[in-house]
Amino acid sequence: MKKNYDAILVVGTRPNFIKAAPLLEYFEENKIDTLFIHTGQHKDKSMSSNIFEDLNIREPDIYLDTPTTNMNKQTTYIVDKLDTLFDTNKSKYVGVFGDVTSTLAAAISTKNKKMELFHVESGLRSRNMDLSLIHI
C-alpha cells in the first residue's frame, strides 16, 4: 500500500537519534506526518536500549535490521532496502543525521528516487584536541 508522508527521517546509530529527537518532536507537535526509519546499523543493545525513553521519542516505524558485516555490505543492504521502501513510502523530503554509513546509504537512495535530502550534523564538537576524530 502506497503512502505519502510529509517527511521521512532515517537514523542508524545512537548519535543519530540524539540529533533527530528535536526535529521528530517538532514534526509531531506540528502534525507533520513523518515516517521514522531505523536502519539498525548499531545492533549493540547497550547502544540503543532505552534511547527512545531517554529522549522521549517514539520508536521507529520501520527497522531494517542491517547486518553487522562490513561498511560496503551495510551500505549496499541499506540502499537496497530504502530503494524498495521509497517505492511505496513517498515524501518530497528525506532527513539524515551525522556521518555514518546509514547517512550515506540514505543519501544514495534519496538521489535514486529523486527526493530532496536534508542533512543535520548539529555541530557537535568537544574542542578536546586529544580526540583525533574531531580535529578541526
Give names to the regions the model predicted:
Residues 117-132:
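A short, histidine- and acid-enriched strand-loop-helix "catalytic/donor-clamping" loop
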Residues 6, 10, 37, 92-93, 96-97, 120:
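Structural motif
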Residues 79-89:
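Short, well-structured alpha-helical segments in soluble
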Residues 1-41:
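N-terminal subdomain of nucleotide-sugar transferases
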Residues 134-136:
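Conserved small/polar residues in nucleotide/adenosyl-binding loops
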Residues 95-112:
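An aromatic- and histidine-rich active-site surface loop
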Residues 32-74, 81:
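Conserved nucleotide-sugar phosphate-binding/catalytic loop shared by glycosyltransferases and other
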